Amino acid sequence: ESRGLGDVYKRQPLFCFPTVASNCASVTAISVIYNPDGSFREYYYPKNANHTFIESSIIADSPEELLWAGIGDALSKECEAVFASKEDELSHTPMMGVQLSKICTTPLVEYGKKALDDLRANKVSYELEQVALDIIISTGLVSNMVSAAPKYYYNSSLAHCVYYGSTVTKGGEKHLHGEIVSLGVLCCLLYTSDA
C-alpha cells in the first residue's frame, strides 16, 4: 500500500526532481490516494521534500499539455485558499499561506502564454521559468502552509471538488487534473462573485 511506502520515506531524506511543471507535488507534503477505480479516496501527509531540484531545460522539453494543466491547477490556489478560509480567524501559518496564495495568479496570467509558446519551441526563457517556479514552488509552499488537517484545511475547496467529482464519472480519466481544476476555478470565481 502507498501509505506503507510513505512511512518509509518519513525516515529518509527526500529529494525531488520534477521533469514537468504540471503541479506542486514535488514540494507539497500532500499525497492524493485514489481507489482502484480511479475515484478519490483520501489525502495522505507523509512529508515534504528536503529539497526540490528544477532543471529548466528539462521543463522546456516536457509535453505542452502538462504545462497547460499545471497553469490550470495553479490558478486554483488563490481562489480556493481565500474562499475556504474567509470565515475563520487564521493563525500565523495559514494566514501566511493565504497571503502567499495571492501572488500565485499574477505570474500565470502575465507570463503563461509566452511560457507555453517557449515550451512549444523547447526554449528556456524567463517567462517559462517564472511559470514553472510558480506552479511547482509557490503553490507547493501554499499547500504546505494551509493544510494542517484536522486543525484546518484551506488547500482544496470548490475548484478541486469539481475535479474529484469527475473521478467518479465515465470518461473523467480522459482529462488531466489541471484541465478539470481550471473549470473548477471558473465555478469558484462565479460562486464567490469574483468572475
Residue ranges and their predicted role:
Residues 16, 53, 158-159, 194:
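Alpha-helical architecture
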